[in-house]
């Protein structure tokens, strides 16, 4: 029997079996023709070409060869030896060559959508249509597709230390289904996470979705979570997606109000130290006995090694303007949250109170002084004026 030109590329058992079948059935007639697909499965990477092998044991009956993906009424025509245009499909051997029995094909630029079972089918020439005669057992084509770069997303709103936040990781378009996903925080592997691969059944490609739960600490401004994906299609290092905890954490400030020494006896300098807060956004208001004295927005900040910030504000108080003790309050609004505050009681010394009283007393007496002078000197002035008038009149008569 004739030997397919491309058979040297086929596995030896397949070649021997085909030759044996040909010798046993070479003159037995068309019912003995065998369609041989030697490979039950073929796996290629996306973008590569896939070779699907098929050989016949006889040229009888006369008729074309066709390739289909899938079986039954919904099968898809991949190649027709007789007619049609199939730009991605080429034949491995020269089909016009005399006594050719090799009907293997190659499909270029494979994508995950090409996955499936392919059947090599022999048709018998008929009128008006050819009739299916015999089909091969089928070759399952699986496509190895790389997963997309993992995308990590954090919580929509910030949370404070000691609270738990969730991070999600997604990757799509990979095949086969087997995949490994791990979570890390600052290089330490996490254990509190759940992962799903969809769909659950067979598919041309798959997606993975994982959610990790992370407990925040005050030192997490510089921390990072990593989603790591390993897959058979990846060469070298696994794929990684990252998220910064600085986008998820809010560290509330601590307040300390103190009085600083001053050279001037009638002035007091009170400071409000706002420490270890994150993010930057902060507004501070000073109140004197509950009344707003000044409001300012933090600008020049000092950054700590852990990524948090410090800021100091001061208030200069004229103690002479107060006869009683003053309650000074430092009120801080941070990152749009409810204001926090701390108060300081500024004591007015007895000397300052007495000094303030003297000033007030003198100021109260000052307007009455001219009146007292007028009351004391008035009669004497009137007497002098009267005597002067009499003397002038007597002088004129004389």
Swiss-Prot record:
Pfam families: C1-set, V-set. Residues 30-136 form the Ig-like V-type domain. It comes from the Eukaryota. InterPro entries: Ig-like_CS_Receptor, Ig-like_dom, Ig-like_dom_sf, Ig-like_fold, Ig_C1-set, Ig_sub, Ig_V-set. Disulfide bonds join 54-120, 169-227. N-glycosylated. One of its GO terms (biological process) is positive regulation of phagocytosis. The chain crosses the membrane at residues 372-392. GO terms for cellular component: cell surface; plasma membrane; secretory granule membrane. Keywords: Cell membrane, Disulfide bond, Glycoprotein, Immunoglobulin domain, Membrane, Repeat, Signal, Transmembrane, Transmembrane helix. Residues 393-398 are cytoplasmic. Residues 1-29 form the signal peptide. It is found in: Cell membrane. Residues 147-246, 253-347 form the Ig-like C1-type domain. It is a single-pass type I membrane protein. Detected in monocytes and dendritic cells. Glycans are attached at residues 244, 269, 291. Residues 30-371 are extracellular. PANTHER family: SIGNAL-REGULATORY PROTEIN BETA. Homodimer; disulfide-linked. Interacts with TYROBP. This interaction results in the recruitment of SYK. Immunoglobulin-like cell surface receptor involved in the negative regulation of receptor tyrosine kinase-coupled signaling processes. Also participates in the recruitment of tyrosine kinase SYK. Triggers activation of myeloid cells when associated with TYROBP. This is Signal-regulatory protein beta-1. It comes from Homo sapiens. The lineage of its organism: Eukaryota, Metazoa, Chordata, Craniata, Vertebrata.
């Amino acid at each position: 029997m004739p030997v397919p030109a491309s058979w040297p590329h086929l596995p030896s058992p397949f070649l021997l079996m085909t030759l044996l079948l040909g010798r046993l059935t070479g003159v037995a007639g068309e019912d003995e023709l065998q369609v041989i697909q030697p490979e039950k499965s073929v796996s290629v990477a996306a973008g590569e070409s896939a070779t699907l092998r098929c050989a016949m044991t006889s040229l009888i009956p006369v008729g074309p060869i066709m390739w289909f993906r899938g079986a039954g009424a919904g099968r898809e025509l991949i190649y027709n030896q007789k007619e049609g245009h199939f730009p991605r499909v080429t034949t491995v051997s020269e089909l016009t060559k005399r006594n050719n029995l090799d009907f293997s094909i190659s499909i270029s630029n494979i994508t995950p959508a090409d996955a499936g079972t392919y059947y090599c089918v022999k048709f018998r020439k008929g009128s008006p249509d050819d009739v299916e005669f015999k089909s091969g057992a089928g070759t399952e084509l699986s496509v190895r597709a790389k997963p997309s770069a993992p995308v990590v997303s954090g919580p929509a709103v910030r949370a404070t230390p000691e609270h738990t936040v969730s991070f999600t990781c997604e990757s799509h378009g990979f095949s086969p289904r087997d995949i490994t996903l791990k979570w890390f925080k600052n290089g330490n592997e996490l254990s509190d996470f759940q992962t799903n691969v969809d769909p659950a059944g067979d598919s041309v490609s798959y997606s993975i979705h994982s959610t990790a739960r992370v407990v925040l600490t005050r030192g997490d401004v510089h921390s990072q979570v990593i989603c790591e994906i390993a897959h058979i299609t990846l060469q070298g290092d696994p794929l990684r997606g990252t998220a910064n905890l600085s986008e998820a954490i809010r560290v509330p400030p601590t307040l300390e109000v103190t009085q600083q020494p001053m050279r001037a006896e009638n002035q007091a300098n009170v400071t409000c130290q706002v420490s270890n807060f994150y993010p930057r956004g902060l507004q501070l208001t000073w109140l004197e006995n509950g009344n707003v004295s000044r409001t300012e927005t933090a600008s020049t900040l000092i950054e700590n090694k852990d990524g948090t910030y410090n800021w100091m504000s001061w208030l200069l108080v004229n103690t002479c303007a107060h006869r009683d003790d003053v309650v000074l309050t430092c009120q801080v609004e941070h990152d749009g949250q409810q204001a926090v505050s701390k108060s300081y009681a500024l004591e007015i010394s007895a000397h300052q109170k007495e000094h303030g009283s003297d000033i007030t007393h003198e100021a109260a007496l000052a307007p009455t002084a001219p009146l007292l002078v007028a009351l004391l000197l008035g009669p004497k002035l009137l007497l002098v004026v009267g005597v002067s008038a009499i003397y002038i009149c007597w002088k004129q008569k004389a």
